[in-house]
Amino acid sequence: MNDFAATHRRWGYKRAWARAKSEGIVIGRDTFRRLWRTEGLRVRPRKAHKPRTQPRLQPLVTARAPGQVWAIDFQFDSDWKGRVFKVCHVIDEFTRQHLAFRVERRMGAADVIEMLDLAVLAHGAPQVLRADNGPEFIAAAVGRWASEHDTLQAFIPPGQPWHNGFVESLHNRMRDELLEDNMFEDLNHARALIGAWSQRYNEEHPHSALGWLSPNQYARQWAQHH
């Protein structure tokens, strides 16, 4: 249990219990919680951050099935020499699946389109693509791509990242579980570790909003019933 907590340091007992159940471990939630606390295991606090001063608004488009709404956004980090790189993420807002990512020092509209093309080959095109107003996303070339795939572009209001809350949540999760604990040698090292983390996240990370299923488990369950 201590080893598990060490490798999942942002998981509380509920998420850990859900994961244990999925692996066939039979134990009641109250018993698991008692053991978790007896071992002195707690969710490690995040670093302090400035609180939001604006209200949390409801998204303008709500996904009600897989493939309806994808969200795309950038995240930044640096290697051990302090050289900054960008990570572009695409997630499915309904299943929370991490569908695609790309790691580069610089990234323009052409790179975004190439990543989206690969995601479409694997999953089909989304009905809606949610993004902020960054130059890579509002570029005419991305608009043409969306038109060719019958995809509506949904841009969030400037300066209001909480409208892209699903992908922001992914950013926080990856920073907590991967970026803060690793020093990347170069881009290939970052790509390898992020790729491995993405696989674990999709297959193993329980979400309370998904009934404590992982994104892949939830997608499979939905497909079985629809």
Enumerate the language-model features and the residues they cover.
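Charged DNA-binding/catalytic regions of mobile-element recombinases
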Residues: M1-H226
